[in-house]
Amino acid sequence: ARRARLALMADWAQRKDISHIVLGHTADDQAETVLMNLARAAGLDGLTGMRGNWDEHGIHWSRPFLHMGREDLRGYLRRQGLAWIDDPSNENDRFSRVKARKALRALSPLGITVERLSETASHLASARQALNHAVSNLADTLVTERAGGLTVPRQTFRHLMPDMQR
């Protein structure tokens, strides 16, 4: 569903000659995402949460409010006299995100808060970036082109950590 929504927004933006879309996700959304991914036993990619910036469907996407709480953003919008639209599905208990939101309230006394989960996602995103950099450097030294294909010495590949192999 998320991919379909992004594709629809991208189609609309391209018809309007818009190249950049800003999304209103907040630290609360990030924490909910991390919690949902934790429930799925996600690896590093899932636990980094939502990306802040990326390019897809010919559009540059950004989430500049990932550092702000949902209520902080709403307070700012109120002070500016700006309205927003809440998706009614955000109150539907059938959806995992709504369940995660409610679970976060229950986990808060344990110190598992929006702020801590968002900070953890940020730390893991930095770790993912470091891993990507290391893999890129390793690929530069190990990968050779042969007969139009790319090869890596099998024995060397087998001795790499699984995250490096992926």
Annotated model-derived regions:
Residues 1-11, 44:
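ATP-dependent adenylate-handling ligase core
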Residues 12-19:
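Glycine-rich phosphate-binding loop signature in dinucleotide/nucleotide-binding domains
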Residues 20, 26, 31-166:
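Flexible helical/loop "lid" subdomain adjacent to adenine-nucleotide binding pockets
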